[in-house]
Amino acid sequence: MNVYDSAHNLSKAIKESEAYKDYADAKENLESNKSLNESFLDFKRRETDLRVSMLSGKEPDENEMEILNKLFEVLSKDPLCSEYYRAEGRYRQLLDDLSKILAEAMQI
């Protein structure tokens, strides 16, 4: 079997999985609410900035941590956001599992 054909079959299977469909639906629902989506994107940007800063060896800014915690608390109470987080988690788990399978196959 051709490796590229297998990769395309895997891609198709992922797109047909419940985890992917739920994630795509949750993402679309979140994006349909402009103000909520803007708040969500702001949270994600701040979270990424904080992680990059911490990875470069800087201590986390306490004020920024507090802002992030409050934003997360507010966002997680919204049904669209909480469903997005759940769906994203399931989808990430699927991708992580597939990555582990591929990594095991590459062990020499």
Features from the language model and the residues they span:
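Terminal, compositionally biased segments used for targeting/anchoring and flexible tails
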Residues: M1-I108
